[in-house]
Amino acid sequence: MASPKGPFGNGPGPPVDRQWTQTEGILEEERDTTMTGRLRILGVVLAVFGLAFLAGGAYTFYRTQEGARSLQAFSAAQQIKLSYNEQGQLVDRGKTEEAQGILSLLENDWGYPVVASDLNPNDPTVNTASEYMYQMATIAYHTMHGTQTVVLTEPKEYKGTTYPAGTYQVPVDGRYFSQFDRQDPLQGPARDQAWSGTAHALIAELGVGTMTATSLQMGYGLAGLFAGIGLTVLVAGLGLVWAARPAEEKAPKTRAIPQPIPA
């Protein structure tokens, strides 16, 4: 039987191409194996980071819950509650008009974005940022819309005007502490009476409550952010591990070859 012709004449050709193909296959398989291993390692690292973020989110949520319970207990102990009528409308001193005036001061003059859902008649205890700010505005509103009684025991003169001794009713007229003329015989005492140390202390305390409630809301937001990032990274890591898993090699199917029947 004649030998197959090679590229340079009779006889078998050199097995160079076949040998190179086998080597290339081995190298490619090794590269695939190395890359698969790296992907698995990366997937495990991502999964660990995801679990860390989930743990951070859970811890942040737990600590925020503790702060919210503490703030609720503080407000309940002080009996700080908002007033609502039978229709569920916010009132102040029994009047909805007063409450609307306070809200107008809070939203229009101070520019605070009141969250309507925070003003809940079913939960009148002050424990949200909007409720604390409403209480702060209530003190400022009544202070600025009040009238102060000033008693002069002797005549006073200021800027060419003489104020005889007597009792005077001085309207605050919507003025803040810094908007009074403290040297005026009537405005000076009226300022100290209207914007007393008690009013300033209450506003400061309510301001702390507002910041605390706002910080708690940010805490819940951070907890959700950590949990979302953690879940995303965890799923991505597990997906890489699953995608880079070793392929299952199936045994080749065998087929019976019919044998010739001897004569």
Tell where the protein language model's regions lie, with residue ranges.
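Charged/polar, solvent-exposed surface patches and flexible loops
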Residues: S70-A73, A137, Y141, A204, ...
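Juxtamembrane interface at the cytosolic side of transmembrane helices
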Residues: T34-I41, A213-A263
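Intrinsically disordered terminal tails
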Residues: D17-T23, A68-R69, D123, A247-A263
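Membrane-helix exit/juxtamembrane interface segments
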Residues: A55-G94
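Short, aromatic-rich amphipathic segments at membrane interfaces
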Residues: G174-G228
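Hydrophobic secretory-pathway targeting helix
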Residues: A2-S70, G228, V235, V241, ...
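Long, solvent-exposed extracytoplasmic domains/loops
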Residues: S83-G197
